[in-house]
Amino acid sequence: MACDLILVLDAPSPRDIAPVLKRLSGTVRWAKIGLEMYTACGPDCVREVADLGYNVFLDLKLHDIPNTVAKAVESAARLPIKMLTLHTCGGREMMSWAAKAQQQHAPELLLLGVTVLTSMSAVHLHEVGVPDSPEAQVVRLGRLAVDAGLRGLVCSPLEIAPLRAALPSDVTLVTPGIRPRDAAADDQTRVMTPAEAARTGANFLVIGRPIFKAPDPVAAARDILAELKS
């Protein structure tokens, strides 16, 4: 199974990292815009990154009542994006409405359900009233998302194998919590190396700090991509 790299843009604006983005554009095909950048500069940042040649993954983790999320998906579909996230804990109806909006307004857009954040452990889940392990909760939410019409999920690398066993093979798995062996885990608790995640069945690996903090970001990205192909 082919596995590709998504570059996390951890900055308030594309202009703040423009030199590195331009250097990486010939090596990395995908870029993720999250809440920090989108809140700071809105849809313009999506267009700027797309204009540099990247496929844009807009990671907004939508979570609201069904009608509001469906309208947000409709609005996002007007942007040059390839992927968009929502929280699976918003429930079946919310995800179903979102999936219908996506199919109507952007059939090629991949709507991804976020399961359990990679910063959360079993202790954190228990604190918010979830008695099960992260793995059990991810599989439960993953099944619910697919039943509601989603064709992709975001999960930690530790839940790739259980999801592959529980879901149809054509479900796309996007995996943060990826750290090369010599990189710090930072604020993530459920992590894996790029090669391990690819072998386990991930379709996309979401990586930011290990590339941007490297002395040579282009070399770091190329090393990860080579590891995925080996």
From Swiss-Prot:
Instruction: Read off the CDD domains from this record.
Output: OMP_decarboxylase_like
Instruction: Give the annotated active site.
Output: 61
For molecular function, the Gene Ontology terms on record are: orotidine-5'-phosphate decarboxylase activity
What name does this protein carry? Orotidine 5'-phosphate decarboxylase
Task: Kindly give the SUPFAM superfamilies that the UniProt entry links to this protein.
Answer: Ribulose-phoshate binding barrel
What this chain does, per the entry, is described as: Catalyzes the decarboxylation of orotidine 5'-monophosphate (OMP) to uridine 5'-monophosphate (UMP).
Write the Enzyme Commission number(s) for this entry.
Answer: 4.1.1.23
> What is the similarity comment for this entry?
Belongs to the OMP decarboxylase family. Type 1 subfamily.
Which PANTHER family would you find in this protein's record? Answer: OROTIDINE 5'-PHOSPHATE DECARBOXYLASE (PTHR32119:SF2)
Look up the domain of life of the source: Bacteria
